[in-house]
Amino acid sequence: MAKKEEHVRKPDWLKIKLNTNENYTGLKKMMRENNLNTVCEEAKCPNIHECWAVRRTATFMILGSVCTRACRFCAVKTGLPTELDLQEPERVADSVALMNLKHAVITAVARDDQKDGGAGVFAETVRAIRRKSPFTTIEVLPSDMGGNYDNLKTLMDTRPDILNHNIETVRRLTPRVRARATYDRSLEFLRRAKEMQPDIPTKSSIMIGLGETKEEIIEVMDDLLANNVDIMAIGQYLQPSKKHLKVQKYYHPDEFAELKEIAMAKGFSHCEAGPLVRSSYHADEQVNEASKKRQAQA
């Protein structure tokens, strides 16, 4: 008789305090009124209440709400996507200006159905924010765009303040975790972005708790640094539903602190590491630190 897979109990340090105030309800109302999507909601981010209610920040998700991929860790809907909304860039920019955001993060579903991977709408969103909210710093978080570097150039030519592309997991687990992406393509994507705009900080994140080893996590650090990535984020994988990959381990906060110490010693300009850390967590602080380091090196 097959042994039943053991359930890993969620520890107390992952319990989240839900802050719901006027900021939270106001942001949610604004998103719905403008027909906008956020990865905060779609990916069930554990920090949504802190970011919306306390920090008043949000990560906009453009190119629709349906992804053409089906990564086994991600809660975003998958299937046949809708037509591109060419008015979306202006609505996002209007919301950024209305919210008076210091830092805006723009991510997107993967659009493998589009020849340009959605790069044109992505780029126009950056340009629209620059026009309507010129003092807002902008972080872009695209998919690998199928490895089409002309599409990446379209985005990098807008000169975002940070280019973020997540490698998500260690090399060994990549085929299981995100079957339609590759570890090496993500590394090349990050390297090419830096080659196109050497002064723009690049960033990548991984989730841990999927069965990786500490040595494999450190290997990811080395691989990112070898491809000139400046900023790294490390967070705990949380299973969005029973259909997704199970959590193999919950890392203690002390283990995250050790990983951050290792990453910083290796040479990252910034590393955010913790159980609830996600790619966009405290992104406004990261762009400031990266800018200071660039100025010091100039």
UniProtKB/Swiss-Prot annotation:
- Location of the protein in the cell: Cytoplasm
Please provide, alphabetically and separated by semicolons, the GO molecular function terms listed in this UniProt record.
4 iron, 4 sulfur cluster binding; lipoate synthase activity; metal ion binding
Pfam families, sorted: LIAS_N, Radical_SAM
Query: What does the cofactor section's free text say about binding?
Result: Binds 2 [4Fe-4S] clusters per subunit. One cluster is coordinated with 3 cysteines and an exchangeable S-adenosyl-L-methionine.
Q: What is its EC number?
A: 2.8.1.8
Positions annotated to bind [4Fe-4S] cluster 2: C67, C71, C74
* Major localization class: cytoplasm
- Record keywords, A-Z: 4Fe-4S, Cytoplasm, Iron, Iron-sulfur, Metal-binding, S-adenosyl-L-methionine, Transferase
Reaction catalysed?
[[Fe-S] cluster scaffold protein carrying a second [4Fe-4S](2+) cluster] + N(6)-octanoyl-L-lysyl-[protein] + 2 oxidized [2Fe-2S]-[ferredoxin] + 2 S-adenosyl-L-methionine + 4 H(+) = [[Fe-S] cluster scaffold protein] + N(6)-[(R)-dihydrolipoyl]-L-lysyl-[protein] + 4 Fe(3+) + 2 hydrogen sulfide + 2 5'-deoxyadenosine + 2 L-methionine + 2 reduced [2Fe-2S]-[ferredoxin]
List the InterPro entries hit by this protein, alphabetically.
Aldolase_TIM, Elp3/MiaA/NifB-like_rSAM, LIAS_N, Lipoyl_synth, rSAM
Query: Which residues are listed for [4Fe-4S] cluster 1 binding in this entry?
Result: C40, C45, C51, S280
What is any one of the record's Gene Ontology cellular component terms? cytoplasm
State the top-level EC class: transferase
Domain of life the protein comes from: Bacteria
Q: Which cofactor does it need?
A: [4Fe-4S] cluster
Q: In which pathway does it act?
A: Protein modification; protein lipoylation via endogenous pathway; protein N(6)-(lipoyl)lysine from octanoyl-[acyl-carrier-protein]
What Gene3D superfamilies does UniProt report for this protein, alphabetically? Aldolase class I
The record's family statement is:
Belongs to the radical SAM superfamily. Lipoyl synthase family.
**What name is this protein filed under?**
Lipoyl synthase
